[in-house]
Amino acid sequence: LSGGYREWLLHHFEELNAEEVRRYDRQMILPQVGSEGQKKLKNSSVLIVGAGGLGSPAALYLAGAGVGTIGIMDADTVSISNLQRQIIHNMETEYVNKAESAKLSLQKLNDRIEIKAYPHALTVDNAEEIISKYDFIIDAVDNFETKFLINDVCVLLEKAFCHAGILQFEGQVMTYVPGNNPCYRCVFEEVPESGSIPNCSQAGII
């Protein structure tokens, strides 16, 4: 290609500026991504509910990949016991709200995307309004009530979402695509009885 790969992309795809081509060209080389895929990432939005051990790497990689709008929600604050696995936080943000701490890290990684922090919990009162603003939802929370809430609202709004859970050395992940596969409630039916499943502070986590 005359002028090189980057120049060809800039000429044919004006929605991606020169800096974006330099930043993302390693993944744009992949035929499964390309310039069209990168433009889709740029114009997409993802809400991550939970900025802990699951939400941390998810948020970092989505920001690095160039997802145009990332919302991150968490009512908790950073504690030193989080830092062993919640890599989006650091000692400087100890005692800071996790959503706000995550926003600081993501802005340092990629200041060309929009980061929205929600320093509060997802509730029955706000879930539909917030979730409706995003293309894709990531359930990275550590309580079953919120997992079922995310599922039910996403099913209602026909939003695709990814559920994930971790405990000790094990993990679980499933993706719901409206009209394509069973939802979280279809598989697990109802919230487990309180105290029947230990949490990370009781059972441990890597």
Description of each model-found segment:
Residues 2-206:
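Adenine nucleotide-associated cytosolic modules
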